[in-house]
Design a protein with these regions (language model features):
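Active-site neighborhoods and metal-handling regions in enzymes and metal-associated proteins
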Residues: 1-258
Length: 258
């Protein structure tokens, strides 16, 4: 999956010659490869993924060479020097002003010896509309989460702690193909279920408790997010009434949003 052409179209629409991509998530969006150090430069006709020796082999195998060239930086060929060379013919070069600190933005201007234009909401605008490939990744991430939950529902029992249930969710998401957690999983039980973003701890699950789980998987950089509440053992009439009331409210909200 490569979004270079979409970015190039947006550059033309904005009257820009190129953009320096420094945010890790947007670097992956632009190149199709996740890096933690380096940069991506997208010009009107070509793009470059600049990385170090730790990632060079994997990057070359992963990116579409017809659209993106992988460039190695090291001590003899520093990152800013390579960026300066690649962007020398770009009169109007933008940078991610919303992702860089003010000091970072000025630092790049000083290192490159030129003024940078603000990219503004370029990537937010592009990423708000998902391609079929992106939607497929999100669906797969959700499938992984649902499969993990299905397994964990057969594991949860009185005597387990919130932390143990969270560990089972994480393990089963990874086992089913997740690249990691969309966010730190939330697992709370009993009185702690009133905490929307409670942190799983050593609280022990009792028979008759509600357990709320909020978790998500990642596939090709795209995340899922799901929340489920289940009763362990049996649910009292009051618990069923509360559960049904919340579900009706949720369904009404979904219907109104369509």
């Amino acid at each position: 999956m490569n979004n270079v052409k979409r970015i190039q179209q947006e550059l033309r629409r904005r009257g820009l010659d190129g953009v320096l991509v420094t945010d890790e998530k947007n670097q992956r969006y632009a190149s199709g490869f996740p890096i933690t150090d380096g940069a991506v430069v997208v010009g009107l006709e070509k793009s470059w993924l600049i990385t170090d020796s730790r990632y060079i082999e994997a990057a070359e195998a992963a990116v579409d060479g017809s659209l993106t060239e992988v460039v190695l930086y090291d001590r003899e060929h520093p990152l800013t020097g390579i960026i300066r060379s690649l962007c020398s013919g770009m009169a109007r070069l933008a940078a991610e002003d919303k992702k860089l600190s003010h000091a970072g933005y000025l630092g790049y201007e000083k290192a490159l010896g030129r003024e940078l234009l603000p990219a503004g909401d370029m990537f937010e605008t592009l990423r708000a509309s998902k391609s079929e490939d992106e939607i497929a990744c999100m669906i797969e991430a959700q499938r992984i989460s649902e499969k993990a939950l299905e397994t964990v529902l057969h594991i949860i029992k009185p005597g387990m702690t919130e932390r143990q249930v969270a560990a089972e969710l994480v393990y089963n998401m990874l086992k089913n193909g997740s690249e990691g957690n969309s966010f730190d999983p939330i697992v709370v039980t009993g009185s702690k279920t009133s905490l929307p973003h409670g942190v799983p701890g050593d609280k022990v699950i009792q028979s008759g408790d509600f357990v709320t789980m909020d978790f998500g998987s990642i596939k090709h950089g795209y995340c899922s997010d799901m929340t489920r509440t289940v009763a362990v053992g049996s649910a009292s009439e009051e618990m069923r009434n509360v559960y049904d009331t919340v579900q009706r409210a949720q369904l009404a909200g979904v219907a109104a949003a369509r």
